[in-house]
Amino acid sequence: MPPKRDPRFNLGLISFSGLIEGIAAGTIFISLPYSVSSLPEGELFSDWAETSRIGFLISSFGLAMFFGQLLAGRMARNIAPRRSIAITGLAACAASTALLVLAASFPQLVLLRIIQGLSLALVIPTTASLLTAYSGPSSRGSALGFFSSAKTLGLALGPLAGGILIGYFGKENLGAVYGLGAGVILLACVPFFFLPSPGLTVNPGGSPGKQTDTSQPNQSSRGSPLFNPGLALGAFVAASCATTLPVFQNEFANRLGLDSFGIAVALSSMLLTRFLVSWPVGRAADRIDEHRLIYAGLLFLAGSTFLLGLAVSFPVLLLARIIMGIGMALFSVPALRIVSGDPESRNHTFRISLLTAAFSCGVGIGPLLTGLCADRFGFVTPFICWSLLSLATAAFISSRQRKTEASTSGAPPGGKPDLSEVSEPVAAGRKTTG
């Protein structure tokens, strides 16, 4: 029987893979608008403005991830070990990234981004499920926050690396950037080969032991619904707010006189801030009600998105993106912690995939709506709309939470609340008193 390994080592492997993949994704992401500008539009998109084509490219990737994550969540219920799904997704993403070198028109670029989205969709919910399987109930928020920090650091460093590479090779030689990105994504597969099958979990004391039930004493797996509409709407809106800058990347560059490295700094600033904040937020989510953090995150997103639309200088643009990074961390880590309860449940990965798919739906539809809104009503309008939607989403989640508390407080003395009426789970892994 092989010796039991410290689960923190497994968490480190997964986080290292996320860091590497994030660097590659960020490098590719900043390069794509330049490909859109240089490649022929194709007959189908000949009447589309460049901004609309960039928005459509981002949307196609996000929608592919949306549908792919629903499939990945279902696959993880029947395929073991789950790490094989992640390896398959990363390998397919590397292949499609390498093929970007051969893209000769905008439609081909869209097709390859769809394949990339479907490939990465296999990785995201599977990775989150593995993280919760390797972490204990009292440290689940910290584990998710640490991985989020590592992945976000990669996404932040990626645009910086991409800006440097584009400056070195030139905008006419993006094939070198895509080729390097494909190689880095393949490297991200390696840590998964060293992961054991996720049959062990960590008890609250932090030592490995046999698999235990980490659900709450008064809460079965049915107490965590498969779909949480409030958090799903929040994920959609958060992603839409975060993608406003990429949609107007070229416009901001022209308005503020920024080169490719300046845009890279603006893109990375949100991600670097999220990197710094995610782990502390995860630790806080292990100790206080996650909803308080979620409300704060949506308020930060509303203010930063509005400020971004009014940016008339690079410092204001940078400040808006930094505030947005804080908001993204305050929303995403606690929301993921809420849906990651009951790791032994057969629907665990699928429940996570529904939240991550909602975020990908925002990445997919949000930029398209942003571009269309700007074309019809002006540049500032989409920023105002997403700000108001962030505030409305916070109010919606708060309303649902109050209804949940009212229904649970109405349970008979000494009895249990009707779990079918509980719309949102109690903070996963936290002991309750009855």
Residues of each region from the PLM?
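Helix-breaking motifs and short loop linkers at transmembrane-helix boundaries and internal kinks
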Residues: 80, 102-104, 289, 310-312
